[in-house]
From Swiss-Prot:
Residues 1481-1500 are annotated as: Disordered. It comes from the Eukaryota. Residues 23-1364, 1434-1500 are lumenal. The lineage of its organism: Eukaryota, Fungi, Dikarya, Ascomycota, Pezizomycotina. One of its GO terms (biological process) is protein targeting to vacuole. Functions as a sorting receptor in the Golgi compartment required for the intracellular sorting and delivery of soluble vacuolar proteins, like carboxypeptidase Y (CPY) and proteinase A. Executes multiple rounds of sorting by cycling between the late Golgi and a prevacuolar endosome-like compartment. Its main location: Golgi. This is Vacuolar protein sorting/targeting protein 10.
Length: 1500
């Protein structure tokens, strides 16, 4: 009977209880409990009969104190119905947690006897594990949550050190945090500092960026209380950006990093939370989501790395003891797309591993649709060798982790030597339903069939009892065995009539010492599903307890001679119950204890020492790099010294050296093996000639920070269509694709390692590893004939491509058009996308929805190319459905933050407008500034948009050789544009003279046409160069050097060192470059720029140019050399090379001190005409490549490349030391960029510090360093943090005034566009620069506030009015203070102005204080001064009480004095200025004349 009265009494969903079998002696006691909803999160408290589970539907939690026989609902406080998750503490058998909804949670410290509630002001994070546990102190836990306000969410991490009695905020915006001591074994055997116990590592976003590639790993030993954390020195003590997450594995802590423009990962490992090392995987590439950290040993890490594109197979690696060098164990391991690997270590026994591998791996590598044939393998020597599983003479194959059907381990348990699995014999593994249950009681050496069909199984009483339940369908029986599976009995489950269950879980206590089991299953009852929790107890079936004769000494491992085998220096034995013993062990909660016998040391007890790796044959350890000789040794190369043998005993290995091998005994080594002696100072040169006269193009496939290897790959296509590749930066070249006609090379736009080589037929090749290997692919059509790229690349998915090919273009009479196809596996399979397109592009996923499949296409309207109407359409499902955004566009551009569309107008037909989107779904018309005078908008150039604002060049004059336009800048969503700079030069191809400085945000240079009026009349253009340091809000001329490189003064003069129209530095820009890659700046050389130009009123022809350099981001310049040079940066700016431009030469100039001094070097015996100088795009290499032809006497024909290698130079032969904790202690200093018009050193509202090598230090930077060290003080807002708002324009004094006759944007729109908005502000003419981080100070864009409709209550709470007594004092106190000050001044007038008396002491003088001519005016004046000082507060208070709100930025009144003559002249009737007494925000102090004001603000 179902005891329904229990339901009514308990008020729970517990619907049934206690069906008990009648038999006791010949069958187990079975109790059934029925639940309405599926039980989830079931677990035992270790070493107890206490079991817990959670109702999977209604949030209730249940506990059983008798191993599942009876269940009670946990009804504590408000817990009932509120459980979101239930989990045990993984390392404390007394603790568990109920994580609730709404920030309420509960903890037990006594195995669910009592519960304590704690609250958190955040919801649980859906992105991270909610709880993070300390490995050795169970009271230390971190909780990872998320706090949302509307759509804005901030991740929060909390911590407790007292088991949630108190809870503290650790940090906000932490993406993932972990304790340094994350496992019980971490640090064992090491003398770790005490602070490591408190150490926490957190992955946080970059200082200037939210992109994952800029993530940093910070740590703190003080819970981030007194510091913002120290950046972990992962790579030789240097910080590494792009940290994805951390993970722990027994004795090791790991951090995975990924650089921008690659999907290759670097894995860094530490065993002490201080010293990190990069893990080397024997040449194997590790990619994102392509490795799995497996259950590791106490002395090594085991990692499975994906080895195929489809993630179907991997390679198993095992590390040395410190986790730095990994060796291959077995290839072609079976894995699935979720990262699960068919791998399990046999519990409690060292060295035995079960894996599944793919037998037909060659076929699987060729095609992802081939079905894998899986075979099982076992290792008895810790993965060194593997062999088949044997059931008799047949090979046995078992289902493993990738298709596990039960909780916990798949094959083994703490029961010594007992291993079970579902599988089959034969050539390979079949379906699960075709499998039978097999068992081994000798740890996998021999197997036999236990039961037919697939079963779930579990071990109890240290293996004395084995329980199995049918797992191919429904059942009402269980099977059990008392003799290691030799024979089996069945027991019926006391379920209601005709009820059978499908087994979901079969489990017992974690140590497998109990005679009690729990089975969870479900059964269908009409349309409902019923759930049962079944307790199975064997305790009463066998009364006898085992004694000594019932046990055997069982060896855990046997060698090939069936003798006990050694591992880690000992043999392992267990005292195990004999299979046929008629007894139970009955030692509940006592884990089996192994016994060890020591062995003599063999080769297997040693590993490679630090800085050594296994030789190719695996028999010896060879140096991984040049060895370091002991101090005082190796005075001569032929000397010898005593050093490491290359081996060391594996830490923890207990072998006996006496009488065994001693591979770690020091040996005598020759000094020639040691680190090379200091370089002799030579620069190496390698010249290569080609038959072609010139190169058509070249590309670098550059390694990133997380890439393995040391190659510097260059690919060149010559003027004769020949393809050459060099892996060592042009020292040696190899021709590739000799038999093919490659017509174009398309490097992947987003991944450095990838390039495609295309032909006109549609056949092609690609490389994924920077030219190390090439693979063929076949496109569905030949490339399109629209002179557009055939390939479009996905920003995040390396293998996703769109191919735009030509159809019906072979002269067959059809209508030639382009058709787009897509692939998600690099062309192995192509799928139709759209017909009659011009081009299609993937859209970057970040901030633009959750779909990776967003594609934008330009398609001819009605699929009719003759209409010339291009539609902009998009889709998120490969155009199963599509959305039309615009019907008649000219083009569109996808940028990092915006999608910008040029839309054809209807009247007139050749006009254009602009549409903008930030999410790829919703477009808005761009509001262009009315003060940009454009008769017809005919051309736009979309410029860089990495600073949360888009820059557009809008053509004003489109006549050939007279082109120029306006540079306009958007707000943060790209829709509202303001004029940034007028008359910016462009050429006939649409390129503009505008360039942003690399490595430093907000600095840009542009060339303007200085004689616009004359150009409109047909005159030639004259140019000036302008620079901005606040992202286009203000522009100035370049300050010229005081003297030239020869110490002579220039023929013009500045005003106080400031440039004037008649005397400034002007540089040749983008439109004059042969190669647009030759930029002023470098991402690696922060703050340095080089250009060619002249000092004077205008830019002169390039033939008369000299070369100039700046080291402070353009604030000051100096002449580097007379004449025009090509330049290139190397080693992040520690090497700068100059080569004459357009002049034959044998020599080059180089500088090792940022251009302060130069040395000449001859690189050729014959003069050469150098066409270009190049290096890797990041400018981190010490190699350069010259491209040119010999032209002097003795010349050789053809193109020549010259590799210039500075790595052997003495001054660049030692790597610089960068200590993240003390960044200025060694070879680096911290450089702070500044704004030229800001005395406080602030730039974009903060002070940033960048690592820069000290120029005087003789060392090299090496791989790309993380230049940005920190963001220091956040500055108060000043005028430099604002730009003119829409329909406002800058005046000569720096203020912003409304354009006559135009209205500002409707400020109330914020209320409709943002549902969370409480208030709107009246327009002031100013808006914040999107890039600024300033806080407080001058809020020029927020002066007078008004409530949004229906938000008056929230507005009132934010800005409470003064009422009653508050209002009274606000009025009376200022007046009283004024009177008091006036009276005081009157009383003390005699002492004012330091009056000097010349012997007369009498009073009554004309100017005596008692004179009515003095006393009355003094009192009046003093009172006016005091009242004038206090009245702004009074007026502000009264105004607020009337409903508005005025934020007074300074101590001035609402109507301010004029700051200059220019401001007085410019003020309009509707303009209100805001000026602070201490800092004139809207103008310049004491400008000499209006011209200087113009120059300062860029209005020329």
């Amino acid at each position: 009977m179902i005891l329904r009265r229990l339901l009514l009494a308990a008020g729970s969903l517990l619907l049934a209880s206690a069906f008990t079998s009648a038999k006791k002696a010949d069958g187990p006691k079975i109790t059934v409990t029925k639940f309405k909803h599926e039980p989830v999160n079931l677990f035992y408290f270790d070493d107890s009969d206490v079991v817990m589970l959670q109702d999977g539907n209604n949030g209730d939690v249940y506990v059983s104190r008798n191993a599942g026989t009876k269940w009670d609902i946990v009804d504590v406080g408000e817990m009932k119905g509120q459980a979101w998750s239930l989990m045990p503490h993984p390392m404390d058998r007394t603790k568990a947690y109920v994580l609730g909804k709404g920030g309420k949670h509960w903890v037990t410290n006594d195995q669910a006897m009592t519960w304590r509630e704690f609250t958190v002001d955040a919801e649980l994070s859906p992105y991270q594990l909610p709880l993070v546990f300390h490995g050795k102190d169970s009271n230390r836990v971190m909780l990872q949550g998320i706090k949302c306000s509307g759509r804005d969410c901030v991740e929060r991490t909390y911590y407790t050190t007292d088991g949630f009695q108190t809870l503290h905020l650790l940090m906000e915006k932490g993406r993932h945090c972990a304790w340094a001591v994350s496992t019980p074994m971490f640090g064992d055997g090491l003398d770790l500092p005490k602070e490591v116990n408190d150490r926490i590592f957190c992955v946080v976003s970059g200082l200037h960026s939210q992109w994952p590639e800029d993530n940093r790993l910070l740590y703190s030993d003080r819970f981030f209380k007194d510091d913002s954390g120290i950046e972990a020195g992962l790579d030789s003590g240097r910080a590494v950006s792009g940290v994805i997450r951390t993970a722990s594995a027994k004795r090791h802590l790991l951090a995975a990093t990924k650089s921008r423009r690659t999907n290759e990962l670097a894995l860094f490992v530490t065993d002490d939370a201080s010293g990190w090392h990069r893990a080397e995987f024997d040449g194997q590439r590790i990619e994102e989501d392509a490795y799995t950290i497996l259950e590791s040993t106490n002395y090594s890490l085991q990692v499975d790395v994906v080895s195929t594109d489809s993630s179907a197979m991997g390679t198993l690696f095992t590390s040395n003891s410190n986790g730095t060098y990994f060796t291959r164990n077995i290839e072609h391991t079976n894995r699935n797309r979720q990262g699960l690997v068919d791998f399990e270590k046999i519990a409690t026994i060292q060295g035995i591993i079960l894996v599944n591998t793919v037998k037909n791996w060659e076929d699987v590598e060729k095609s992802s649709v081939v079905e894998k044939k899986i075979v099982s393998r076992i290792s008895f020597d810790d993965g060194r060798t593997f062999q088949p599983l044997k059931a008799g003479k047949q090979d046995l194959h078992l289902h493993s982790v990738t298709d596990a059907t039960n909780y916990g381990r798949v094959f083994s348990s703490p029961a010594p030597g007992l291993v079970m699995g579902v599988g089959n014999t034969g050539g390979h593994l079949k379906d699960y339903s075709d499998g039978d249950l097999y068992i081994s009681d000798d740890a996998g050496i021999n197997w036999k069939k236990a039961l037919s069909d697939a079963h779930k199984y579990e071990f109890g009483d240290q293996g004395s009892v084995i329980v199995a339940v049918y797992d191919e369908g429904r059942t009402n029986k269980i099977s059990y065995s008392f003799n290691h599976g030799k024979s089996w009995e069945k027991a019926s489950l006391p379920l209601p009539d005709d009820v059978k269950i499908r087994a979901k879980i079969l489990t017992t206590m974690p140590d497998s010492t109990s005679l009690k089991f729990v089975l969870v299953g479900s059964a269908k009852a009409d349309s409902d599903v019923e759930h049962y929790v079944i307790a199975i107890d064997f305790a009463e079936m066998e009364e006898r307890t085992c004694v000594d004769p019932d046990f055997e000494k069982w060896p855990a491992r046997l060698n090939e001679k069936q003798e006990p085998d050694c591992l880690m220096g000992h043999k392992q034995f267990y005292r195990r119950r004999k299979a046929d013993a008629n007894c139970f062990i009955k030692k509940k909660f006592e884990d089996p204890i192994p016994n060890f016998e020591p062995c003599k040391c063999t080769e297997e007890d040693f590993e490679c020492d630090f800085n050594f790796i296994r030789s190719e044959d695996g028999k010896s350890c060879v140096p991984a790099r040049s060895l370091l000789a002991p101090e005082g040794a190796c005075k001569n190369p032929d000397d010898k010294y005593t050093g490491s043998s290359g081996f060391r005993l594996i830490p923890g290995d207990a072998c006996i050296k006496k009488g065994g091998l001693e591979l770690d005994k020091p040996i005598e080594r020759v000094c020639s093996d040691t680190m090379k002696t200091p370089a002799a100072g030579e620069i190496a040169v390698e010249k290569t000639f080609f038959t072609a006269d010139n190169y058509r193009d070249y590309f670098y496939l550059e390694r990133t920070g997380s890439s393995r290897g040391d190659d510097e790959t260059v690919i060149m296509i010559t003027s004769e269509q020949e393809i050459f590749i060099s892996r060592d930066h042009g020292k040696r070249w190899k021709r590739i694709f000799e038999a093919e006609t490659i017509t174009r090379i398309e490097p992947h736009r987003y991944f450095n390692d990838v390039a495609y080589f295309l032909t006109n037929s549609g056949e092609g090749w690609y490389t994924l590893d920077r030219g190390e290997n090439f693979r063929e692919f076949k496109a569905p059509l030949p490339p399109n004939q629209d002179k557009l790229p055939a390939l479009s690349f996905h920003p995040d998915r390396r293998d996703w491509l769109i191919w735009t090919g030509a159809e019906e273009c072979n002269g067959s009479g059809g209508q030639c058009h382009s058709v787009a196809y897509y692939t998600t596996n690099r062309g192995a399979e192509w799928h139709f996308l759209m017909r009659y397109v011009r081009r299609c592009e993937f859209i970057k996923r970040d901030a633009r929805g959750s779909s990776d499949k967003i594609v934008f296409c330009e398609q001819y309207e009605d699929e009719n190319p003759s209409s010339k109407h291009l539609q902009l359409i998009s889709s998120e499902d490969w155009f199963a459905e599509k959305k039309v955004h615009y019907n008649n566009i000219l083009d569109f551009a996808t940028m990092q933050e915006f999608i910008i569309v040029a839309i054809r107008g209807e009247k007139p037909q050749d006009s254009l407008s602009v549409g903008v989107s930030i999410d790829g779904k919703t477009f808005a018309d761009a509001e262009l500034p009315a003060n940009v005078k454009i008769p017809i908008q005919r051309a736009y150039t979309v410029l860089e948009s990495r600073t949360h604002a888009a820059f557009l060049h809008v053509t004003v004059n489109n006549l050939e050789d007279h082109e120029y336009g306006s540079l306009i800048k958007s707000n943060s969503n790209g829709t509202s544009y303001v004029l940034s700079l007028s008359a910016v030069n462009r050429n006939s191809r649409g390129y503009a003279d505008f360039e942003k400085m690399q490595g430093l945000e907000g600095v840009a240079m542009a060339n303007v046409v200085a004689n616009v009026d004359d150009v409109e009349k047909g005159a030639a253009k004259k140019y000036r160069t302008m620079i901005t340091h606040n992202d286009g809000a203000e522009w100035t001329l370049l300050a010229p050097p005081g003297k030239d490189s020869e110490g002579r003064a220039y023929g013009c003069s500045t005003k106080g060192g400031k440039p004037t129209k008649a005397c400034a530095l002007h540089l040749h820009s983008y439109t004059e470059r042969v190669d647009p890659r030759d930029t002023y700046s470098s991402p690696g050389a922060v703050g340095i720029m080089i250009g060619t130009g002249n000092v004077g009123e205008y830019l002169t022809p390039k033939s008369s140019a000299d070369t100039f350099i700046t080291r402070d981001a353009g604030i000051s310049w100096e002449e580097a050399k007379k004449g025009k040079y090509q330049w290139e940066y190397g080693d992040s700016g520690s090497i700068i090379v100059l080569v004459p431009e357009s002049t034959p030469t044998k020599t080059l100039l180089y500088s090792l001190d940022e251009g302060r001094s130069w040395k000449e070097y001859q690189f050729s015996e014959v003069e050469m005409q150098i066409r270009d100088i190049s290096t890797v795009p990041s400018d981190t290499s010490r190699n350069f490549l010259l491209w040119g032809n010999e032209v002097g006497q003795g010349k050789k024909p053809g193109l020549a490349t010259v590799n210039i290698d500075f790595s052997g130079l003495k001054e660049r032969s030692k790597q610089c030391v960068l200590n993240e904790e003390k960044p200025e202690a060694d070879d680096y200093y911290l450089w702070e960029p500044k704004h030229p018009l800001q005395p406080n050193g602030c730039l974009f509202g903060h002070r940033a510090k960048y690592h820069r090598k000290r120029p005087e230090k003789d060392c090299y930077n090496g791989r790309e360093i993380q230049h940005l060290d920190s963001i220091g003080d956040i500055c108060e807002c000043t005028r430099s943090d604002y730009e003119c708002d829409y329909n406002y324009e800058p005046q000569t004094d720096g203020t912003c005034a409304r354009v006559p006759g135009l209205e500002p944007l409707d400020p109330k729109l914020v209320c409709t566009e943002d549902p969370k908005a409480i208030e709107w502000y009246e327009p002031t003419g100013y808006r914040r620069i999107p890039l600024t981080k300033c806080q407080g100070g001058k809020q020029l864009n927020h002066i007078i506030a008004h409530p949004c409709p229906n938000k008056e209550e929230e507005f009132e709470k934010k800005h409470p009015r003064l009422r009653g007594i508050g209002l009274f004092f606000a009025i009376v106190i200022p007046i009283g203070l004024a009177a008091a000050v006036g009276y005081y001044v009157y009383q003390h007038w005699d002492g004012k102005f330091g009056r000097i008396r010349l012997g007369e002491t009498g009073s009554g003088g004309f100017f005596d204080r008692d004179s009515p001519l003095i006393s009355i005016p003094v009192t009046i004046v003093a009172g006016i001064v005091a009242v004038a000082t206090a009245l702004p507060l009074l007026v502000s208070s009264l105004w607020r009480s009337l409903g508005g709100y005025i934020r007074v930025p300074g101590s001035g009144s609402s109507r301010q004095p004029y700051s200059s003559r220019g401001a007085f002249a410019a003020r309009r009737g509707d303009y209100v200025g805001v000026v602070d007494d201490e800092d004139e925000l809207l103008g310049t102090d004491d400008l000499e004349d209006d011209e200087e004001g113009e120059e300062r603000n860029g209005q020329v």
